[in-house]
Every structure is written in structure tokens, then in C-alpha cells.
């Protein structure tokens, strides 16, 4: 059965909207907000952005002459809620309250659920979120660190990791809950997850940057040297956070997080106009190989979490477009399994659309947020 689904995916500087009739894309549009527009909300509650983003949404629907009464469901990007199990959740009063107050932080993704609920409620239609970044299915042993005061957290690319895992399971002729996968999502940050029978029982932190170094994240650092930097008086806490979560990894070593530009430079010696690469080709090659080495090592670590019982390794996100990276990871981790799936990119709107369709076709899978 085909369903008409409206997808709302707000980001820090943009909104992505999609409307679908079954497999057909009716439209997909993005709004990029100017710095001036965003600066007008500086220091204000996130909810004050709702009128701006609502106007874009309604204007787009009007532009494409969408009959609102034909919409079967609305789904928004999940925000910083309580840590929850993966799955599809109806946007109930408890969730709405936590999105509005920013239970786990304030980010424009919180507005996805708020706007979805608002539109759906006016139409008397169901509304959902699916697999937000706060999905937490980690087993107790995975939470431990060597400090009693510090626990490992589950923050990762849950929406895309779950989507590609479900896709890979179908290609194997199985259900997701019957499979064990290691999934690597690589973008500005990298998360590597151990998927055991439908749950991500351990995963590297793709937000704070624990795990391998990435195009923008530092990854795990030697503890003592980091402590010494913290107390050196040379950095504020904001500066160190930026070094770890925006200026680390490939940016720190090569001057860029643009992997396409970096690899072209490694291969041909040519940089794109305006390139920020600031190192030799040899240094760029070694840093790139070091990142691949660390990602591969994290995949190997997750194989031990699954006790070697791995149906496939899945590579996704923007990094999966780079054939050299994919081939080097396969070379290093092929002893774990000979089955690899590569799904470059990460289509959040498609993932949300598919989640809403599953919910409409199988209402029993819909979860309640508490």
C-alpha cells in the first residue's frame, strides 16, 4: 500500500522538507537560512525559531499545491530527548514537552518533532520521529570507563546506521533482528556500531569524537597529555572542545576536512580553488592512512564485542564514496568476514520516509515515549 508522507528535517542552518507518494518523490526542498536570520535568534529560546521554519514549510507545501488532507503521516527528525531504544516513536505529550525544554540539549533537530506534531495534529493524522541520535541500546559492560564518575555514552548516527543495517539484512534475505553487523558511518564524525540482533549494543561516540580520528574529530587522545593541555593555561575550555570536535583529525593534520579535495591532492598533487590543505602530499597520504587505520581498528574492536559472529561489515556516510578508503578498510578487516555492504552517503529524508511507511503498515512496532 502506498502512503503520502511529509518529512521534516531541521538542521543548524537549514531545513530539509520532502513529500512522497509511495516510492515517488513529489518534491524535496531545502532552505538555507542567512547568518543575519540566524543571528536574530542568538541568545533566545530555540522555540522562537518555530515561526520562521513553519513559514518555510507551509510556503513549500503551498508552492507545490499539496492537498494537506491527502497526507497520511508526518515524520520529523528526532531531537535531543532522553536516551531511548531505537525505533519509531509517536510524538506524544511527554516527547513534545522534552523537545520544547531540550531535555538533553538544545539543537534545531528538536524542532522536527515539534513541527511534525503541529502539522499532523491540525490534520488529525499520525506523527512520528525515528532513531534520533540519543538512541541508547548499549549493554552494561560497554558503559564502563576506568573512572567511576564517568560512563560511556551512546550518541551516534543512529538513523542512518539503522537504515543501512535494515537494508543489508533484506539483501541477505533476513530480518534485521536476525543479523549481527558492524556498521561504520563516516562523515565529519565517525561512529562504528556493533549491531546484535536488532540492537546497537556498543558504539563509538560520533559526536564528542571518541574512537578513531575523523575528518573533523580528534578521536581518543592520550589522557595525560590532554590533561596537561587543559591545565597549561594556553586554552579555554571552548577552544579545546573546538580542537577535539571541529578542528581535530584531518583538519589538524592536513588543514582540511574535505576528503574529496584531500584525496585528489594525494593522487594528483592538485588542489581545488580555495583549498585549505597546508601539508605535503606525503604528509597528507600518511594522515589519511592513519585515519583509515584507526577506523579499521575500531571495526576490529566491535568484532570482539560480537565475539566474531559477524554477518557483514557495512560502510556508509560520505567517507564511503572514497574507493581507496573502502578498499583499505576491506583489506584490514576482511579477516572478520568476507561480506561487505557499501552504501555511500546518508539520506536522512529517505530514512525517515521509510520509517513512517513501516509504522503505517505495522502499527504494532510504534513505540511510546515516556
UniProtKB/Swiss-Prot annotation:
Q: Name one GO molecular function term.
A: butyrate kinase activity
* InterPro entries, per database record: Aliphatic_acid_kin_short-chain, Aliphatic_acid_kinase_CS, ATPase_NBD, Butyrate_kin
Main site of residence?
Answer: cytoplasm
PROSITE patterns linked to this entry: ACETATE_KINASE_2
Compartments, record wording: Cytoplasm
Which Pfam families does the record match to this protein?
Acetate_kinase (PF00871)
Q: What GO biological process terms are annotated to this protein in UniProt?
A: acetate metabolic process
Q: What is its EC number?
A: 2.7.2.7
> One GO term of the cellular component aspect?
cytoplasm
| Keywords from the UniProt entry | ATP-binding, Cytoplasm, Kinase, Nucleotide-binding, Transferase
Disulphides: none
According to its UniProt record, which reaction does this protein catalyse?
A: butanoate + ATP = butanoyl phosphate + ADP
Q: Which domain of life is it from?
A: Bacteria
Similarity remark: Belongs to the acetokinase family.
Q: What HAMAP family does its record include? A: Butyrate_kinase
Name-wise, this protein is Probable butyrate kinase
Q: Which organism is it from?
A: Elusimicrobium minutum (strain Pei191)
Which gene is the coding source of this polypeptide chain?
buk
Amino acid at each position: 500500500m502506498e502512503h503520502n508522507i511529509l518529512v521534516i528535517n531541521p538542521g543548524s542552518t537549514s531545513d530539509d522538507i520532502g513529500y512522497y507518494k509511495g516510492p515517488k518523490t513529489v518534491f524535496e526542498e531545502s532552505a538555507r537560512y542567512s547568518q543575519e536570520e540566524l543571528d536574530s535568534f542568538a541568545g533566545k529560546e530555540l522555540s522562537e525559531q518555530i515561526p520562521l521554519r513553519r513559514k518555510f514549510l507551509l510556503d513549500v507545501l503551498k508552492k507545490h499545491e499539496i492537498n494537506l488532507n491527502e497526507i497520511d503521516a508526518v515524520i520529523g527528525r528526532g531531537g535531543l530527548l532522553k536516551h531511548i531504544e531505537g525505533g519509531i516513536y509517536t510524538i506524544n505529550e511527554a516527547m513534545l514537552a522534552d523537545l520544547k525544554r531540550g531535555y538533553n540539549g538544545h539543537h534545531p533537530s528538536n524542532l522536527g518533532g515539534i513541527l511534525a506534531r503541529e502539522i499532523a495534529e491540525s490534520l488529525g493524522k499520525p506523527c512520528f520521529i525515528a532513531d534520533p541520535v540519543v538512541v541508547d541500546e548499549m549493554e552494561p559492560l560497554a558503559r564502563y570507563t576506568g573512572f567511576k564518575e564517568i560512563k560511556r555514552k551512546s550518541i551516534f548516527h543512529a538513523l542512518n546506521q539503522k537504515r543501512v543495517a535494515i537494508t543489508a539484512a533484506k539483501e541477505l534475505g533476513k530480518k534485521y533482528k536476525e543479523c549481527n553487523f558492524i556498521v561504520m558511518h563516516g562523515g565529519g564524525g565517525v561512529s562504528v556500531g556493533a549491531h546484535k540482533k536488532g540492537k546497537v549494543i556498543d558504539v563509538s561516540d560520533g559526536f564528542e569524537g571518541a574512537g578513531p580520528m575523523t575528518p573533523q574529530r580528534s578521536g581518543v587522545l592520550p589522557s595525560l597529555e590532554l590533561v596537561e593541555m587543559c591545565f597549561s593555561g594556553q586554552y579555554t575550555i571552548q577552544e579545546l572542545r573546538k580542537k577535539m570536535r571541529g578542528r581535530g583529525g584531518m583538519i589538524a593534520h592536513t588543514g582540511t576536512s574535505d576528503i574529496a579535495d584531500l584525496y585528489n591532492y594525494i593522487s594528483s598533487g592538485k588542489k581545488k580553488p580555495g583549498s585549505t590543505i597546508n601539508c605535503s602530499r606525503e604528509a597528507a597520504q600518511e594522515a589519511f592512512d592513519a585515519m583509515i587505520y584507526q577506523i579499521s581498528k575500531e571495526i576490529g574492536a566491535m568484532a570482539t564485542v560480537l565475539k566474531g559472529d559477524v554477518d557483514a561489515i557495512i560502510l556508509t556516510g560520505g567517507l564511503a564514496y572514497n574507493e581507496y578508503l573502502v578498499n583499505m578498510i576491506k583489506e584490514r578487516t576482511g579477516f572478520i568476514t568476507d561480506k561487505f555492504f557499501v552504501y555511500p552517503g546518508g539520506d536522512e529524508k529517505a530514512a525517515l520516509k521509510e520509517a513512517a511507511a513501516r509504522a503505517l503498515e505495522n502499527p504494532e512496532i510504534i513505540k511510546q515515549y515516556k
